[in-house]
Amino acid sequence: MSLDKQLKDIIDSDLHRYGYSSEGQMGFMTKRECYGYRYSKVLRKCKWYREHDKKILFLFERVKLRMLSEKLGFQITYSTQIGRGLYLGHMGSIVVNWKAVLGDNVNLA
């Protein structure tokens, strides 16, 4: 399995928690309004690029992660270990320690 395929599978498992089987099912406005999924997607990409030495992509995603963190009130670092199926249920003040280990299908709401 290629690295990009693995990243896509992880992101799709997060998307499944929001009730969609693929991004194609989501309309444009749904993508804009689904803040938890937007944040988790950028978080996953940031972590992935950091671990696989893709520095330019990592820096780009890190800036996006920082902007979304400030906008939404989420403080979850890319170094936090998170299993598949992350669900962020609401906007505003969600803080996770960088040493935390979260399993599969975790709800943070």
Q: Which residues make up each language-model segment?
A:
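Beta-solenoid/beta-rich acyl/carboxylate-transfer cores
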Residues: 75-87, 91-107
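Terminal amphipathic alpha-helical/low-complexity segments used for targeting or macromolecular assembly
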Residues: 1-72
